[in-house]
Every structure is written in C-alpha cells, then in structure tokens.
C-alpha cells in the first residue's frame, strides 16, 4: 500500500472457485488505480492455482501484486458470517474505510473517488450507503431491481461484526456508534455496485442455514421472512404458511420500522395458500396487503391474476384499475421484477377476457404480451407464471370456437 492518498480503502471478499470473475472483479476494484488501496481475499476451498490467476488479473490492469492480501480457510460446517468476519479481519491497520463485495459484483468506474469524497465530507460517518443493482436486463443492461446498500464501514477494530449464518448483516458496537454517529451516501445519480450472478451456482445449503438462523435468533424477523420465502421457493407451502403465520403474529404485536415487511409477508402467504387451493385465505391475504400498503403493486397483480383464474373478470379489471391508480414503484429487495412488466399485465387481461368469451380481444392481449418476452430471464419468469399454458389454452379455445389460430408458442419454451 504505497499510495500517498490520505484515505485508505480496503476491499475484502470471500470466494471459492470463482476464477471466471477474476479479471472483471480485480479491474473493478482497482479502477485504474483510483479504487482500492488493498484487496483482501479469503479463499474457502478453491482448486490449486487461484492465487496465480489473481496475480495475472492484477498484471492486466497494472495493479501491484503487493496490494493483495490472501488467506485460505476451510469451514465445516459452513456459515457466511464466520467467513465474512475472517475476511474482514485481513485488512491492514492503516485502512480507513472498508467495503465488502463478492466476486460476481462490479463497482462502477469512479467509485473510489466518490467514496473518498463522501467520507472526507462526513468524517464521523460509520456507514456509507450506495445503490446496488441486484438484477439487470440481459439485453439493455438497465437495472431491474435495485435498492440502497451498505456494506461499507470503518476499520473493524472500532467495533464491526458480521452476524447470522446466511443473509448476514453488519452490526456495530455502541462504542462504534458513538465514535461514528452519522451515515454518508454516495451520489444517488448512479448505481455504484452491480450484481451479475452465476446462475448455475447452487443454493442447496441455504435452507439449512436459514433454519439454523431461526434456531439461533428466534426473534429475528428478517430471518423468519427469509425462511418462509425459502420454503416457498422449494414448494414447501405448508411450511411457508406455518412460519409466515408465526411471523405475522409477531408483527401484529411487535411493529418494526419497515413499511413493506407485513404487506410483503401477506403476499407470500397468499401465494402459498393459492398453491394448496385455499382460495378464500389466498384472497384475504392479498386484500390485507393492499389495505396495509395501497401503493405496493405485487398484491394487486397477484389478486387480479387470482380473480381472472376464478372467473371473476369484472373484479379482476377493477383491481387492475386500482393498481394503475395507486401503485408506486419503490426500490426494495422484496419487489418482484415482473410485477412491473407489461407481459404480466397483458397475460392477466387475456385470462379475464377469455372467461368473458371475448376471445379475439384476449388474443390481442396475448400477442402484445408475447412481444414483451425477450430474454432468457423473461422466458423463465413467464414459465413460472404459467404464461405459455395460458397462451396454449387460448389457442385451443380459438380453434374450437372460430377455427382460427393465435398465440403460437415454442413447445420447448
């Protein structure tokens, strides 16, 4: 760390067999010499040769090899907080500000200058917030889901720790908060950190870690939400309802400063009730979500879809009308991207029109929807939402009624 700048930045990360990201990640963290003064990497079990590959990545962008700090540790059992803490503790004593990233993430050019600027302007800031794009459009590159993020803090010696075995979070001691009582924010005109995940990466250990988190921290409401959601991802709908209802009861007694927690939980419960055929409970949950947070779009979309499938088209269109009048897009990690996509709304309208016997109008809606499904991610989400089954159902109905064809879909989609 030979740079003469007053403010020293350390990036720290954990990794295992992620060499496909080395070149991009190192270039991003170095940022032509304007980014990190030090890059600390804790390897958790990569195959041999990972250090040489990282050195080669540094050479490509003229980053001195001595700016790396390497360590390796194998964890059994695995938990993210332990690895994060060990990687954080690799930073040098001269470090002023730390930022944690993963190797499938990219900090945009200019991040180092911006971080130094905001920290120098707010010398008592203990946390620095910035916009983080969790997902992006594969064709346009535009962010689909983004929200404020804060994995940036002062030196851990002042009292910083990662907590929870999964979906780990930074926590700070009282002494740290007294020393650094304020927060700072990087310019909101940019999304500073972008996530480009490896879609082949297994999440097989997540459920066990979430169950462990619930066991270790039974009062942790976010952990309970993550657990209920993970059960739903795996099709374990009874478990989702069990844990989601438990969390809902806690939220009724112990309010938290999070306006989306309860309405998002109602949507999660409604989706699981729908999967097990509990229609009344499903509809109740969506309605409660709308009452709690009238601008939250997800509940409107889910309720409208449910009403369309239940042959209640007039109510479906009324909910869609309310959605257009009331919903406001907020950037939160619980938002589902396709709730704001045109294809989803046209799918719902087509379903409702089919029940009304207006098949030609339904076909128009479905054609418009098909035109909005463009990327592999769109196709995956459309499959998840039974889009192609609905299109084929309409196609069959039109053939039977009018002898026409529409909505041709690829049988492999």
Locate predicted features.
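Flexible helix-coil transition and linker loops at the boundaries of alpha-helical arrays
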Residues: 213-217, 248-262, 327-338, 375-382
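Short, well-formed alpha-helical segments that are part of the catalytic scaffolds
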Residues: 10-33, 38
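Catalytic-site signature of metal-activated, phosphate-bearing donor transferases
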Residues: 81-88, 107-242, 252
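A conserved acidic beta->alpha catalytic loop
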Residues: 28, 35, 39-58, 75-77, ...
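TPR alpha-solenoid repeat register
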Residues: 223, 257-258, 265, 299, ...
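Active-site nucleotide-sugar/metal-binding loop of Leloir-type enzymes
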Residues: 85-97
């Amino acid at each position: 760390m030979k740079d003469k700048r007053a403010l020293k930045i350390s990036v720290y990360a954990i990794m295992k067999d992620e060499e496909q990201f080395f070149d991009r990640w190192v270039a991003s963290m170095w940022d032509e010499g304007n980014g990190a003064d030090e890059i600390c990497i804790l390897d958790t079990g990569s195959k041999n040769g990972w250090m040489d590959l990282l050195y080669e990545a540094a050479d490509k962008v003229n980053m001195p090899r001595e700016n790396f700090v390497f360590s390796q540790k194998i964890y059994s059992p695995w938990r993210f907080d332990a690895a994060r803490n060990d990687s954080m503790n690799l930073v040098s004593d001269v470090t002023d500000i730390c930022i944690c990233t993963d190797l499938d993430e990219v900090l945009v050019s200019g991040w180092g200058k911006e971080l130094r600027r905001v920290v120098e302007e707010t010398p008592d800031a203990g946390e620095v917030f910035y916009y983080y794009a969790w997902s992006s459009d594969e064709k346009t590159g535009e962010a689909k889901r983004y929200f404020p993020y804060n994995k940036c803090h002062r030196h851990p010696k002042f009292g910083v720790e990662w907590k929870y075995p999964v979906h780990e979070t930074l926590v700070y001691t009282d002494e740290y908060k007294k020393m650094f009582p304020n927060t700072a924010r990087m310019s909101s005109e940019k999304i500073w950190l972008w996530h480009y995940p490896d879609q082949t990466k297994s999440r097989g250990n997540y459920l066990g870690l979430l169950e462990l988190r619930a066991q270790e921290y039974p009062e942790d409401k976010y952990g309970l939400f993550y657990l209920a959601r993970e059960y739903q991802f795996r099709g374990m709908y009874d478990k989702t309802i069990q844990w989601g209802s438990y969390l809902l009861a806690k939220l009724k007694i112990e309010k938290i400063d999070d306006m989306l927690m309860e309405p998002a939980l109602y949507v999660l419960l409604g989706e699981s009730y729908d999967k097990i055929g509990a229609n009344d409970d499903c509809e109740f949950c969506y309605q409660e979500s709308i009452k709690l947070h009238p601008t939250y779009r997800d509940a409107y979309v889910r309720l409208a879809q449910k009403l369309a499938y239940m042959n209640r088209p007039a109510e479906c269109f009324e909910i869609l009308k309310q959605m257009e009048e009331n919903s406001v897009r907020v950037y939160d990690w619980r938002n589902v991207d396709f709730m704001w996509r045109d294809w989803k709304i046209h799918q719902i309208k087509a379903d409702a029109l089919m029940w009304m016997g207006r098949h030609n109008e339904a076909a128009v809606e479905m054609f418009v929807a098909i035109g909005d499904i463009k990327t592999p991610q769109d196709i995956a989400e459309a499959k998840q939402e039974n889009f192609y089954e609905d299109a084929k159902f309409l196609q069959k109905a039109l053939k039977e009624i009018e002898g026409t064809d529409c909505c041709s879909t690829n049988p492999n989609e």
